[in-house]
Amino acid sequence: MKSKRNDAFQNKSIKVPFVVPNIDSSDKKAIAIALKSNLLTDGPILRKFEKEFSRFTGSKYAIGVSNATSALQLSLKSLGIGKGDEVIIPDITFVATANAVLFTGATPVLADVNEDDLNISINSIDKNITKKTKAIIPVHFAGKSCNMKSIQKFAKDNDLKIIEDCAHALGTKFDKKHVGTFGETGCFSFYPTKNLTTFEGGMIITQSKKMAENLRSLRNHGITKSLRQRFTKGHPWDFDIKQMGYNFRIDEIRSSLGLNQLKKIKKMNKLRQSACKYYNKNLKNIDGISVYEDPKLESNSCHLYVIKILSNFGITRNNLFSNFVKNGIRTSVHYKPLHKFSLYKNKCKIYFPLKTSKSLYPQILSLPLFPQITKNEMNSVIDVLKKQQK
């Protein structure tokens, strides 16, 4: 029998971790190659990573950044969104979505989510549009695409910008088109739990040359030239700054890792899809458990596997979480709704009741999911749920 995996949070083994980063020998080799370079940031490996990422997503331009939060923030700033403006975001999302809006001086407006996939509700978007609304940030939750056709129509009819939060969705498509290409920008995360990791990192994609040039400047203090341009043409100190920028760069080492991971992403996503199918098959007939089945799973990056604990299951979500811990299995919740955080109670606006997010929050639970997960590990998870019925 295979030995238990190490727990990332405690110095001991665990039966089933929540996630295991997919780092193999080829990734380590890619990192080693980057370390031999004399240029460890803003160099040729980043350019190649951006080029290949652009090709993979079908976008014209890709801009590597330090993380997805900075990707969102730069996108908002590049679109001129700031103080006095409102940006519609889903109530169930990671806090970074709200923080990026707040950093610009704009106000996040919390919209409700769909019962069937936890993506932002189209009806809720419609209700929350005001004279101050400047943009919508749809979050492709767990890897399932939002209804981008409807969101694009709302945006066009109301002269709004779209910034896609694709942190969960590398490989996700809507109508055969990669997410992130429907809005002004698409923002991706390379955090260790994501489908592609650079430890920390992110990427912005856009179809606009003007926006791409502006984003490259903004990520590097507002400087108008790249390092290569500065040191190969004229004097390296002779550059201009026309706007306030940030230090949101991504280095060559992480770019090399990301470039290598990108070569494997289709295979890794297929493994995730297979794991989701196995969970669905074994969980959908358990009384009190509701699974989120996606009929277009091949277009879903399957970043998370979320179940809903119904009232007839016998115990609460929190008690089930504790049962998993007792059995050496880590689970989590994605996410605590934004309206429940102290900061956002004061900083965000809620124009209409968030009925669905409020009702779903005590019910949802994310089960272990990663490309390397085995059937034995998934069976351990399934057994805990089945035993609760006895």
Predicted regions and their residues:
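Active-site PLP attachment segment
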Residues: 181-225
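Phosphate-binding glycine-rich loop
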Residues: 39-86, 100-104, 110-112, 177
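N-terminal "arm"/small-domain region of PLP-dependent enzymes with the aminotransferase-like
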Residues: 1-39, 44, 240-242
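Structural detector of well-ordered beta-strand residues that form the stable sheet scaffold
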Residues: 63, 88, 109, 162-163, ...
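PLP-dependent aminotransferase class I/II
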Residues: 5-8, 46-51, 59-63, 123, ...
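PLP-dependent aminotransferase-like
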Residues: 77-166, 173
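Conserved active-site segment immediately N-terminal to the catalytic lysine
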Residues: 164-198, 237-242
